[in-house]
Design a protein with these regions (language model features):
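Non-catalytic terminal extensions of PLP-dependent enzymes
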Residues: 1-5, 12-13, 158-185, 198-204, ...
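Conserved phosphate-coordination/catalytic loops
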Residues: 2-5, 25, 79-86
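Gly-rich Lys/Arg/Thr-decorated short loops/hinges at beta-loop-alpha junctions or inter-strand turns
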Residues: 10-16, 67-76, 345-346
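Short loop-beta-helix segment that forms the pyridoxal 5′-phosphate
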Residues: 12-34
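General small-molecule cofactor/ligand-binding pocket signal
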Residues: 21, 67-69, 376
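Short glycine-rich or small-residue beta-strand-to-loop segments that form or flank ligand, phosphate
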Residues: 21-23, 107-110, 350, 384-388
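Short amphipathic alpha-helical segments embedded in low-complexity Lys/Glu-rich regions
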Residues: 26-29, 75-76, 383-384, 420
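Conserved PLP-enzyme active-site core in the AAT-like
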Residues: 30-40, 44-293
């Protein structure tokens, strides 16, 4: 109410939403609010397995069943991209074949990803709505809030695409386009045909329900933990009460007023100056790419990856390769934004450092401790550089000077160190760039956590898996190097995770509660050389659900609490 309500209404206008909620606990909380408000126990949500942990924990809180879908891997750089549209469509079609499409309530994706992969949000929503017209979309755009204020990137945001779809729905040509495609497809087209076709939804059946979360503190000028949850939902009146309950669940009763004010200031700044600020951030990023990749010394040991290295060719329908390609211009970049299944956020730059003999964590430490350059994300052999609305050309000059200095030190070490130094360096580079572990995919939930899951879908009761860990006698620990793990992987019984296991980097859960652990997951963990692994204690080992406990999952416990009489 009052001033805050007016500020939220202005934010909704700025972002193209029906309503916006200010959140003071970060986008982790925004995500959990949305998941809790929109999903109920037993509902199915199609979720990117590599999304932020807040989404997974949100599923636990809601009692919803995640149906995990996999992003395409970039094994060479120990990171994942984004989830192909055909993978999402296949999940929906499988649910339909199993007679459980009505239970699939939400598609939950990260846009853009930490490494800069941007979905074709309009195409994703249109094709999914062609299969399920009332599907809810939750776009986690924690790192992409600034994109609304770029005429080039806006179309790739959840709300930007939602507004475009809404306008299309009111165009009489939309019905004709739908009916024309239906006539071409005929009755009961096969899944193979549906997967190959760019599906057009029936505009008369669509119930447009789009939610978008933004970390305003990440890419704009809000105080730390300032976040916005934006809503464009024609059915919001049916969930408004539970949405408020979700807000009450997570919001502090003692919010920081300066933080709330900073969200309004950020909105005002971006409405007045956002176009120029974002354009400058993009220009800064392209200048960094050009300076790194064209410098004879720096490019000998470092390089910034382009779309041709980060996005497989089958997802770049326009043929766009890189912002630095001689044939690249704004027209080809716009064609990529319009046509490609995935494109790259130009402000996010993956700098390969493994070719200089540094792993990501090591190089991050050097930049921070010796040169006061802050890096947010690393991989086995790269670091992520980001330009933002506050960067200047001086920042570019400083970064390039630092990279040239480090490259010079590497070069001198090899020149002066002789054959042994070169041999050691080559072995180190090979270890970082070639001998990389395969990235593990999600396997499946143990049958004890599958309930009535469909034959073709892999959703599971993650909430029961999570709380199974609360039963200490029902859990066991096995160290990663214990031969017992290898024996059980071969002969059984299955290893079932009792917790989330999240190594940093890469920062996604390689195990979730209730998941059956496979050989590829163990191999990946054994090859990890990172120090930070949430949910795993090297001294104790992997926390597993005992087989005896699995057999009891879902059965009523003896001595259930008696019903209490009403107070007289």
């Amino acid at each position: 109410t009052g001033t805050i309500k007016r500020a939220q209404d202005k934010a909704a206008r700025a972002l193209g939403a029906d309503r916006v909620f200010f959140v003071t606990n970060g986008t982790s909380t925004s995500n959990k609010m949305a998941v809790q408000a929109l999903l109920a126990p037993g509902d199915i949500a199609i979720v990117d397995r590599n999304c932020h942990k807040s989404h997974h924990y949100g599923m636990v809180l809601a009692g919803a069943q995640p149906l995990y879908v996999e992003a395409f891997p970039m094994t060479e750089y120990s990171m994942y991209g984004a989830v192909p549209l055909n993978t999402i469509k296949q999940a929906l079609l499988n649910a339909k074949a199993d007679g459980r499409l009505d239970r699939v309530k939400m598609l939950d994706l990260t846009n853009c990803t930490f490494d800069g992969h941007i979905y074709n949000t309009r195409r994703v929503m249109e094709e999914c709505l062609a299969i399920k017209p009332d599907l809810i979309f939750l776009w986690d755009e924690a790192w992409f809030g600034f994109a609304r204020f770029s005429p080039f990137l806006r179309r790739r945001t959840g709300l930007g695409a939602a507004n475009a779809i809404e306008a299309w729905m009111h165009d009489p040509k939309s019905v004709a386009a739908y009916e024309k495609q239906q006539a071409e497809l005929g009755k009961n087209p096969s899944n193979e045909v549906l997967l190959k076709t760019r599906l057009i939804p029936d505009p008369r059946q669509i119930r447009l329900r789009v939610y978008q979360t933004n970390s305003t503190h990440k890419s704009m000028s809000a105080i730390r933990q300032g976040s916005m949850l934006s809503v464009k939902d024609v059915e919001f009146h049916t969930v408004e009460q539970q949405f408020k309950e979700a807000v009450f669940t997570h919001a502090s009763t003692s919010p920081n007023q300066q933080l709330i004010a900073s969200l309004d200031v950020s909105r005002r700044q971006m409405e007045l100056e956002g176009y120029g600020l974002v354009a400058n951030a993009i220009e800064i990023a392209i200048a960094i790419r050009k300076a790194v990749n064209s410098n004879p010394l720096i490019s000998r040991y470092f390089r910034v990856l382009g779309a041709d290295a980060m996005v497989p060719a089958q997802y770049r329908q326009s043929g766009f390769k890189d912002y630095l390609d001689p044939s690249a211009n704004w027209a080809s970049a716009l064609k990529s934004l319009d046509d490609d299944e995935f494109c790259l956020d130009p402000t996010r730059m993956t700098l390969v450092c493994g070719t200089a003999g540094y792993d990501g964590t090591q190089f991050k430490g050097i930049l921070a401790n010796e040169y006061n350059i802050q890096i947010n994300k690393t991989s086995r052999n790269s670091v992520l550089l980001q330009s933002n609305i506050n960067n200047t050309r001086s920042d570019v000059a400083h970064l390039i000077r630092v990279l040239a200095e480090i490259a010079g030190e590497v070069d001198r070490g090899l020149t002066q160190g002789g054959a042994n130094a070169k041999k050691t360096f080559e072995a180190r580079v090979k270890s970082l760039m070639t001998d990389v572990p395969d990235l593990p995919n999600f396997s499946h939930f143990h049958p004890s956590f599958r309930g009535d899951a469909g034959a073709k879908t892999n959703e599971g009761d993650i909430r029961s898996g999570f709380y199974a860990a609360y039963d200490a006698p029902g859990c066991e620990f096995i160290r990663l190097g214990d031969p017992e793990i290898d024996r059980r992987l071969k002969a059984g019984p299955e290893l079932v995770s009792a917790s989330f296991v999240i190594p940093y980097p890469p920062g996604f859960p390689i195990m979730v509660p209730g998941q059956v652990i496979t050989q590829e997951t163990i191999d990946f963990m054994r090859k990890l050389d990172v120090k930070e692994i949430h949910g795993y204690d090297a001294k104790e080992g992997l926390k597993l659900v005992r087989i005896e406990a699995l057999a009891k999952i879902g059965k009523p416990k003896p001595g259930a609490a008696p019903k209490l009489k009403a107070a007289s």
